[in-house]
C-alpha cells in the first residue's frame, strides 16, 4: 500500500469510553482468577469469611492507586502519560530510568504471557503428561507474532478483538458465578453451612493477613494502564474517570462471585490442593466441559497479550519522540501505528521465549515498578506544592496518595527483609547500568552515522514516516 502524502500521520484521539473500559477490564483480569485464587485463602488461615473480606479490601486499595494514576493521566493527557509526568517532576534522567526498566521487563512480560497462553492452549492435546517444550515455544512465538501483526494494523483492528475477548472472559466468569449462586440456593446443606460458618475458622495472624492482602492486591494490578493510552482517548478528563468507575466495581463483583462459587462447590482444603481451581470446579459441576477450561484461559491470556504489546510499543514510541531512543522508533505506518516499536518489542519478546532462563532473571525486576509508584505519589505531591496553578481537571483525595505509597513501599521492603536474595543486588546494579547508555547517547547526544542511513533504508522498506508532530500536539492541546 502506497502512503498518501496528503494524509496526516500521527497518533489520533479515536478511543472512547467503551474501548477504554474494555482495555481496563482486560488488563486487570488475567489467568489468576481461573487458575489459582488460593493464595488469599491460604494466608487467611482457610478462614472463608476473612478471605472474602480481604478481596473487598484489596478492591478498595486498587481503587485508591488507580485514582492516583488517574490524576496523572488527566493532568498530562498524553500517550504514556507517566513518562511525561516523571520527566516534568524529576528530570529526563529519572524518566529514562523508567524507560530503561520497561525496555527489559516489557519483553519478559510478553514472553511470560505467550508461554502461559501456549501452555494452556496445547495442554488438552497431552492429557496424560506435560506438553513438550518445543511445541509450546513454537506456539508461543506464533501467538506473539500474530498479536504483533494485529497491533501494527492500528487500534481500529484491535477494537473488535478486545470486545470479543472481553465478552468471552466475562461470559466465562459470569457462568461460574451464576452457577455457584444457583448451587448455593439449591445445593446441599454442607455448602450452605460452610458459608454460614464462614468466620468460625482460626483468625490469621497479622503477618499472614498482610501477605493475603498482597496476594489479592496483585490480582487487581493493571488499573493504571490507561496512562499508556491517555493520548489516544477522546476527552480523557471525562473518559478516564468513567472507565475506572465502571471497570473496577465490575471486576470486584465478578471476583467476589467467582470466589463464592469456588467455595460453594469446593471445600477450603480441596481449593488449596488444586493447581487449577477453575478446572477442578468444572470437573465437579459439569465434567463434560472440563476440556474447554484450558481454551478459555488461553482466550483470556490472548487479550492480555494484545494489550501488553500495545502498551510496550507506546512506551518506545514516546521515548523516541523525546530523544531517548533512536528516531526510528517514533515512525508510524499508514495505520498510525508505531510499527518499528511493535517490531522491536515483539522481537525482544521472541528472544526471551527462546531463552526462558532470562525470564526468571527479568522477574526480579518487577518489584522495581513499586518504586515507580512511590515516586509517582511523591511527584504528585511535589507538583501540587510547586505548581499549585497547574490545570488539574481532577485531583485525587490526598489520603489515597499516602495509602498507595505505603502499600507500594511495603511491596519493595517486605521481599528484601523477608527473603533477601543476591538477585536483588543484580537488579540494583542493572538499574544504575542505565547510566552507561544515558551519559554518552542522550546527555552528550552521541550520533551514529550508520544508524541514520539505516533509518532512511527502513523507512523506505516498511513504508513508514516520522509523525506529523504539529497535528499530534494540536490533538493533545484540544484535550
UniProtKB/Swiss-Prot annotation:
GO terms for biological process: amino acid transmembrane transport; aspartate transmembrane transport; L-cystine transport; L-glutamate transmembrane transport. Gene3D superfamilies: Amino acid/polyamine transporter I (1.20.1740.10). It comes from the Eukaryota. The keyword DNA damage does not apply. Its main location: membrane. The keyword Phosphoprotein does not apply. Keywords: Amino-acid transport, Antiport, Cell membrane, Disulfide bond, Membrane, Transmembrane, Transmembrane helix, Transport. The chain crosses the membrane at residues 15-35, 48-68, 90-110, 130-150, 166-186, 209-229, 243-263, 290-310, 339-359, 361-381, 397-417, 424-444. Belongs to the amino acid-polyamine-organocation (APC) superfamily. This is Solute carrier family 7 member 13. The gene is Slc7a13.
Amino acid at each position: 500500500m502506497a502512503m498518501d502524502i496528503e494524509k496526516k500521520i500521527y497518533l489520533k484521539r479515536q478511543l472512547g469510553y467503551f474501548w477504554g473500559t474494555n482495555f481496563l477490564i482486560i488488563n486487570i483480569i488475567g489467568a489468576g482468577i481461573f487458575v489459582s485464587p488460593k493464595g488469599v485463602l491460604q494466608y487467611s488461615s482457610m478462614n472463608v469469611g476473612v478471605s472474602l473480606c480481604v478481596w473487598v479490601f484489596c478492591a478498595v486499595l486498587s481503587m485508591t492507586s488507580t485514582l492516583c494514576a488517574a490524576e496523572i493521566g488527566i493532568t498530562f493527557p498524553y500517550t504514556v502519560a507517566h513518562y511525561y509526568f516523571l520527566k516534568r517532576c524529576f528530570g529526563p534522567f529519572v524518566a529514562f530510568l523508567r524507560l530503561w526498566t520497561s525496555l527489559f521487563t516489557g519483553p519478559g512480560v510478553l514472553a511470560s504471557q505467550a508461554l502461559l497462553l501456549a501452555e494452556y492452549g496445547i495442554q488438552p492435546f497431552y492429557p496424560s503428561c506435560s506438553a513438550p517444550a518445543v511445541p509450546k515455544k513454537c506456539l508461543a512465538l506464533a501467538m506473539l507474532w500474530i498479536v504483533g501483526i494485529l497491533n501494527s494494523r492500528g487500534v481500529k483492528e484491535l477494537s473488535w478483538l478486545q470486545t470479543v475477548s472481553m465478552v468471552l472472559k466475562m461470559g466465562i466468569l459470569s457462568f461460574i458465578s451464576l452457577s455457584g449462586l444457583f448451587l448455593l440456593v439449591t445445593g446441599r446443606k454442607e455448602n450452605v453451612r460452610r458459608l454460614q460458618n464462614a468466620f468460625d475458622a482460626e483468625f490469621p495472624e497479622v503477618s499472614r493477613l498482610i501477605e493475603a492482602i498482597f496476594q489479592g492486591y496483585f490480582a487487581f494490578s493493571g488499573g493504571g494502564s490507561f496512562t499508556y493510552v491517555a493520548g489516544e482517548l477522546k476527552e480523557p478528563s471525562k473518559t478516564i474517570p468513567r472507565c475506572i468507575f465502571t471497570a473496577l466495581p465490575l471486576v470486584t463483583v465478578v471476583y467476589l462471585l467467582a470466589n463464592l462459587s469456588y467455595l460453594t462447590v469446593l471445600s477450603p482444603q480441596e481449593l488449596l490442593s488444586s493447581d487449577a481451581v477453575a478446572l477442578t470446579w468444572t470437573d465437579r459441576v459439569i465434567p463434560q466441559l472440563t476440556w474447554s477450561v484450558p481454551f478459555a484461559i488461553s482466550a483470556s491470556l490472548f487479550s492480555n497479550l494484545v494489550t501488553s504489546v500495545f502498551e510496550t510499543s507506546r512506551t518506545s514510541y514516546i521515548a523516541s519522540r523525546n530523544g531517548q531512543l533512536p528516531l526510528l522508533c517514533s515512525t508510524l505506518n499508514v495505520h498510525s501505528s508505531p510499527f518499528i516499536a511493535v517490531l522491536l518489542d515483539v522481537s525482544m519478546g521472541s528472544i526471551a521465549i527462546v531463552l526462558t532462563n532470562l525470564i526468571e532473571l527479568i522477574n526480579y525486576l518487577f518489584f522495581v515498578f513499586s518504586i515507580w509508584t512511590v515516586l509517582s505519589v511523591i511527584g504528585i505531591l511535589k507538583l501540587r506544592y510547586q505548581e499549585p496553578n497547574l490545570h488539574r481537571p481532577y485531583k485525587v483525595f490526598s489520603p489515597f496518595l499516602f495509602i498507595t505509597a505505603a502499600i507500594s513501599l511495603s511491596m519493595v521492603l517486605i521481599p528484601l527483609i523477608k527473603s533477601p536474595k543476591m538477585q536483588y543486588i543484580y537488579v540494583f546494579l542493572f538499574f544504575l547500568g542505565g547510566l552507561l547508555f544515558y551519559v554518552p547517547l542522550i546527555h552528550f547526544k552521541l550520533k551514529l552515522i550508520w544508524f541514520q542511513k539505516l533509518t532512511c533504508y527502513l523507512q523506505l522498506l516498511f513504508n513508514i514516516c516520522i509523525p506529523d508532530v504539529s497535528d499530534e500536539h494540536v490533538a493533545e492541546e484540544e484535550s
